Regions:
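Gly/Ser/Thr-rich loop/hinge elements
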Residues: 5-60, 87-92, 108
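Short acidic, Pro/Gly- and aromatic-enriched capping/linker segments at domain boundaries
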Residues: 96, 101-105
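Short catalytic/ligand-gating loop segments at beta-alpha or beta-beta junctions
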Residues: 32-33, 78-88, 166-167
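Short, well-structured beta-strand/strand-turn elements
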Residues: 57-59, 72-85
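Conserved functional hotspot residues or short segments at active or partner-binding sites
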Residues: 113-189
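Extracytoplasmic/secreted envelope proteins and their assembly/folding machinery
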Residues: 9-16, 47-50, 62-66, 70, ...
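Flexible glycine-/small-residue-rich
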Residues: 54, 104-106, 128
Length: 189
């Protein structure tokens, strides 16, 4: 989502549904106060750990996806605060062929946050390099935000693996506890 200026509301909902099985994705509130809420459809493609890179260039529809991932605790946002364009706009073509963009609603993140003009603060804030990186260096070791996202993803995976190792349903753990219960000793090593 980093440096993604946005797109269509419906597209951002569809993309979010790839990662959010259930739960609110976004709510829109019209100028008349009518609120419409869009949710996951139970057909997420994956439950695997997720880290999303964001920055001040992440706006509008990309903020819908980022907000849905963050508020649903589906993944971590890494980078800089997003742009803060929490508006739904419609393009009208005029008779002379020119266009007019009209704001038709504002949107709220799943937690009800209006991010217009304030943006979304990432879970892990990482400023970019003082000297801009080259296009070919994006997503490489020279990209500080990418490295921070990679590190966080590894941490998430390691935490999940540690938790599953000590799952009470794990028969090896149950056998270990039974043996050590008799000795009244429990090793943390």
């Amino acid at each position: 989502m980093r440096s993604n200026p946005g797109g269509l509301l419906e597209s951002s909902i569809d993309i979010s549904r790839h990662f959010i099985n259930k739960g609110i994705i976004v709510s829109t509130v019209s100028k008349d106060g009518l609120k419409e809420t869009k949710k996951g459809n139970g057909q997420a493609l994956t439950k695997k750990p997720l880290v999303v890179l964001v920055n001040e260039g992440s706006a509008s529809a990309s903020e819908i996806v980022s907000g849905a991932i963050k508020d649903n605790k589906r993944g971590k946002l890494v980078g800089k605060k997003t742009f803060g364009k929490g508006l739904v706009q419609s393009m009208r073509t005029l008779v002379d062929g020119s266009g007019l963009t009209v704001t038709v609603a504002k949107y709220l993140t799943p937690n009800g946050t209006d991010i217009n003009k304030s943006g979304i603060i990432p879970d892990i804030e990482v400023k970019m390099n003082i000297n801009p990186i080259l296009q070919r260096e994006i997503g490489t070791r020279k990209d500080k935000q990418y490295r921070a996202g990679e590190k966080e993803l590894i941490n998430i995976i390691n935490r999940k693996n540690l938790i599953s190792e000590f799952n009470p349903a794990n028969t090896n753990l149950n056998a270990f506890l039974k043996i050590n219960k008799e000795d009244k000793v429990f090793s943390l090593n």
